[in-house]
């Protein structure tokens, strides 16, 4: 299965990992004036429903906060996004439209590729 669907599974995983895994996300931050870069009325903590209380200060960066772990943490986030999104048909419709009858096998191969 890894050999048969390697091209399709790698296309899916790499596209979702790179385009949406790395290409999405919001760094909550305040500027030098203390203004937040998100709508505080609309965006809430997804676990509590309360206002967001932790965020980056002005001039703070991702790598400053996480040090040497920042790149590994970002790769794990991108992989998680890719693995979540392959649960849905839309990526298969976009990247493997002519393989509909093989989508289950390609899906399974995606998981194998991630752990192989």
Predicted regions and their residues:
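Catalytic glutamate of the conserved HExxH
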Residues: 14, 18-23, 80
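Post-HEXXH active-site segment of zinc metalloproteases
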Residues: 25-74
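Short pre-active-site segment immediately N-terminal to the catalytic Zn-binding motif
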Residues: 1-14
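Secondary-structure transition/capping motifs at alpha-helix termini
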Residues: 23-34, 88-97
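Long, well-structured alpha-helical subdomains associated
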Residues: 62-76, 80-116
